[in-house]
Regions:
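Non-catalytic, C-terminal membrane-associated alpha-helical segments of glycosyltransferases
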Residues: 209, 225-287
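N-proximal low-complexity "stem/linker" segments adjacent to membrane-targeting elements
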Residues: 1-25
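Short aromatic/hydrophobic "clamp" motif used to bind/position activated sugar donors
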Residues: 79
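Conserved donor NDP-sugar-binding/catalytic core segment of glycosyltransferases
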Residues: 91-122
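Short, acidic, metal-binding catalytic loop of nucleotide-sugar glycosyltransferases
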Residues: 24-33
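Cell-envelope/extracellular polymer assembly enzymes that use nucleotide-activated donors
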Residues: 4-6, 35, 173
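Glycine-rich, basic loop-to-helix element that forms the pyrophosphate-binding segment
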Residues: 43, 57-74
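A short, conserved alpha-helix in the catalytic core of glycosyltransferases
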Residues: 142-150, 154-159, 164-192
């Protein structure tokens, strides 16, 4: 069968019902044939699940490495990345994505609009700063990995996600590298994905990894003069958000020390042209 695009779903096998619904929402798409790749992260594949390709890792390799594994096993030029508990809402969504990517070959990534079971979009799910409505499409400086579409050419050019990040900040890191390579990131407000309402992760391990990874990506991607500005800005924001929790504050401190004392990511700083472009788009790489 000739496919129009690929879809990658990363799963740890703990939501079989939701995974089936995610796959069904892809299979129900009209006017497109989709190659589905399931990545079984840390477990043996369930080959009865409907997919063209099943790949797996014996241990939990993390979100970025898991999605990289899926992408490396796709065959098409456009790749949908979908959380295993998310569903495409309309049956023509992937056809419209195909048209979007065909209409502008400078788009590397499209971030889809996430709505919850009540049809609402959380502010943290809109990949831009400011009060601009979640219903307005446009270029952005970031995207949401579990409801996104990537052009394989751009993905391969920059090397996909940084696997060392394991959890958190991988989208920001990839966004910076995509923009620095001259590509666009587009928030498509009219292309909607339903995902159950969730609260921001506040447990200590997530806080630790997020802050450590912020420092790692800053040291890898930012011009030297911006590195301390970015780190100190986010130190202030993160501490302010977690003042009531001593465990969270300890996790921030540990992440700060770990991030400063290690640098696993290859350094390739943003050009000042890219910094200016990001600033014009409303999010300079200091926040």
């Amino acid at each position: 069968m000739k496919f129009d695009m690929s879809a990658v779903i990363l799963t740890m096998g703990d939501r079989p019902g939701a995974l089936k619904e995610s796959i069904n929402s892809i299979r129900s798409q009209e006017n497109v044939n989709v190659e589905i790749v399931i990545v079984w992260n840390g477990l043996v594949p369930n080959y009865s699940v409907d997919a063209e390709t099943h790949v797996h890792s014996d241990v939990n390799i993390g979100i970025p490495a898991g999605r990289n594994l899926g992408a490396s096993n796709t065959s098409e030029k456009i790749i949908l990345f979908l959380d295993d508990d998310a569903q495409l809402i309309s049956n023509d969504l992937l056809y419209r994505i195909k048209r979007l990517f065909n209409s502008d070959d400078s788009i590397a990534i499209a971030s889809l609009r996430i709505i919850d079971e009540d049809g609402l979009t959380s502010r943290r799910h809109v990949p831009r700063l400011g009060s601009k409505s979640e219903a307005i499409s446009g270029q952005t400086t970031g995207f949401l990995g579990g409801a996104s579409v990537a052009r394989k050419l751009a993905w391969d050019q920059v090397g996909g996600y940084s696997a060392d990040l394991f959890y958190s900040m991988e989208e920001t890191d990839l966004s910076w590298r995509i923009l620095n390579a001259g590509w666009k990131i587009f928030y498509a407000a009219d292309l909607q994905v339903e995902h159950p309402r969730t609260e921001p992760t506040r447990h200590s391990e997530a806080i630790y990894l997020t802050f450590r990874n912020r420092i790692w990506i800053a040291k890898a991607n930012l011009p030297f003069i911006l590195i301390p500005i970015y780190i100190l800005t986010w130190l202030g924001i993160t501490v302010a958000r977690n003042l009531s929790s001593s465990k969270a504050l300890l996790a921030i401190f540990k992440g700060f020390i770990s991030g400063l004392s290690s640098s696993p990511l290859k350094r390739s700083p943003l050009s000042w042209k890219t910094v200016a472009r990001m600033t014009k788009l409303g999010r300079p790489p200091i926040i």
